[in-house]
Amino acid sequence: AAGASLFAEAGETQLGATVKSNVSQQRVPVTGDAGHWVHVSESPRHVRVIYNGETIADSKHAKLVREAEVLPVYYFPHEDVRSELLSPSQRRTNCPYKGEASYWSIAQGGKQAENASWSYQDPLPAADAIRNHFAFEWNKMDHWLEEDEEIFVHARDPYKRVDVLPSSRHIEVLIDGRLVAETRRPRLVFETNHPVRYYIPQEDVRMDLLVPSATKSRCPYKGPADYWSVKLGEQQFEDMVWGYMEPIPECPKMKGLLCFFHQRGAD
């Protein structure tokens, strides 16, 4: 099958099927030697949840739950939740680390979100700090705010870093043996528990080979991403390239640069 490959500093050790670089691509296990873990801390941020124009939860004492292999989740004290808008449902789920969760649906202004909130009323010892706290299904709510800034996708992990560093590495991107990008001025993005990514100025990319895609995504740490496919003759490699045209203020050095998927082959 045809494939996409990315080379950096020719002659160095190959770290994977498609990447050559002296930058380690190994992921750090989230669980570590201690096995599964659940970490609960009180967030110093003012966090709000809005549904159908109404603030459902509003707290300066929300708990942030970080758990191995699970995205961070905000849990709100009962007194900071509009509990009169919640009605209990029959749904129950069980977590071997936190206990049994009960669910509530939310009704507001003629609109209803089924099983949109859950709580551990009698949690296991590891999660006792979230007893009588309520969490909300992210995508069933309309808006989430930390202080006065809207946040997207999921709660942000305060222990996660995204470092964007200028580099003079020689980077070449080849797809099906054809050079589609070459640069000596990439920006390398080092993100906790993610492989190193190489972001390339558009001037160093064969933009005439890129076709804008309808695909969109959003990262809570970097912002909204646009995608491009690569067209080589009659063959098109879908969504092979992405870039943050308007990154969040914390990542301005990524603005307008393009990155290629170099871990997967091109179908």
Where is each model-derived feature located?
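Terminal leader/tail segments of proteins
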Residues: 3-7, 11-267
